[in-house]
Amino acid sequence: LSFRVRDALIDIIDVYSMNEDEMQAYLGRRVDLLDAHQLHLDLVQLHALIPARVLVVHTKYWSIALGDRPHNYAHALRGGVVMASTRYVYGDGFTAADYARVEAFPTSTAGTAVALELAATFGASAVTVPGLQLDTLTPTTIGLGDTFVGGFVAALAR
């Protein structure tokens, strides 16, 4: 059913977004999220399967927007990363001050390396944002994809 809905809407939506698990389900295999060379091939295949104007994939290491004018979405990717990271660190009851603290966190070393390599490989057809370095003893892991989308949309609205 989701394929039928996607196919019916693909020509009228601006952004189609998914997380790493959904990407792997579409591709039918596990994906090494830190292998930039293989990721490039996987993301090209994924965008061929889902020919959205802009395809967004968000993972714990990096996020990417592929397609038509992807650089218009760089701030939205960052908004999604910061929002999901804030929820991960502070849970459901996070505040604007918590968000501001997380926004200042350094990026993850592994995520930055992959994001830079993907950006170089895709050139103008993609924009990437690395994930943040997150350290907490009590992570909130449920709902991070939805929280990413909320942060993405909130950043677009600003």
Question: For the regions a protein language model found, what residue spans apply to each?
Answer:
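Active-site beta-loop-alpha junctions enriched in small/polar residues
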Residues: L1, D21, K60-W62
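Structural recognition of alpha->loop->beta junctions
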Residues: F3-A25, R78-V82, T86-A96
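Conserved phosphate-binding/catalytic region of the ribokinase-like
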Residues: R29-R158
